[in-house]
Amino acid sequence: PTSPASKSKFQFVTPQEAARRIGGPVRTIVGLEPDHIEIGPASGVPGAQPNLSVVRVVYMTADGERMLLDQQRIPADANGFHPIDDPTLESGQTAYGTETNGVSVATWLDDAGYRISLAAKVPVDSLKLLVNLVR
């Protein structure tokens, strides 16, 4: 059987390899234990910055659904700014949305230049609580 990682061109990696590939610490959700970590192309994540690998921390919810914490580390320019092709994220806001299948997504740029998205089959209010636990 094919794993979810192989179907989406994401590959299983160790936490150490993920940190090496992203060029810094991997963000996780405080108080939750990851199921595994994957790495894959930006093309596998809507809105991801091209030409930068995506590290995906996968969590399993109590009802067996996958919760995905995708992250890219955006390189700083000469001024220390982390340029990203998204005015909402550049302004420091977190973008929230819910897809027709009930999956809610939060996307933001943290102070260290990580573009992060958290996707889970939960209401947006619950997702907002989880976003506050990402470190």
Question: Language-model segments: what does each one mean?
Answer:
Residues 2-114, 119-132:
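Short, solvent-exposed recognition patches
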